């Protein structure tokens, strides 16, 4: 039963990974920015670094591309500004955990 559960979790992770690849490749904003720049992105924004000015410039992690996650920050003056950083979304973290667990079990 445990082997079946691990295999099903691995299949779900692989499907999630492949669908994430397809979605990332087809994002309209990213395609427009690539056409505007007319150059491949060799420099990307690492995990935990600010991506406020380039929301589609995050690097790839082990399995997935990091996503630019934004939050509203209120300064002491009461001014609201948006701050963004590259990070791993929770569902990607869960998929990486399942894959890591599978690697430990099956070597």
Curated annotation (Swiss-Prot):
This is U1-lycotoxin-Ls1u. InterPro entries: Spider_toxin_CSTX_knottin, Spider_toxin_CSTX_Knottin_CS. Disulfide bonds join 44-59, 51-68, 58-86, 70-84. Belongs to the neurotoxin 19 (CSTX) family. 04 (U1-Lctx) subfamily. Residues 21-41 form a propeptide. It is found in: Secreted. GO terms for cellular component: extracellular region. The keyword Secreted applies.
């Amino acid at each position: 039963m445990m082997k079946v559960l691990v295999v099903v979790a691995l299949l779900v992770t692989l499907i999630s990974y492949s669908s994430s690849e397809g979605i990332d490749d087809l994002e309209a904003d990213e395609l427009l920015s690539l056409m505007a720049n007319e150059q491949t992105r060799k420099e990307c924004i690492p995990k935990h670094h600010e991506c406020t000015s380039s929301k589609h410039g995050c690097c790839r992690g082990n399995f997935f591309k990091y996503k630019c996650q934004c939050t509203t920050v209120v300064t002491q003056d009461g001014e609201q500004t948006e701050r963004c950083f590259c990070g791993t979304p929770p569902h990607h973290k869960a998929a990486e955990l399942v894959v890591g667990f599978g690697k430990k079990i099956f070597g």
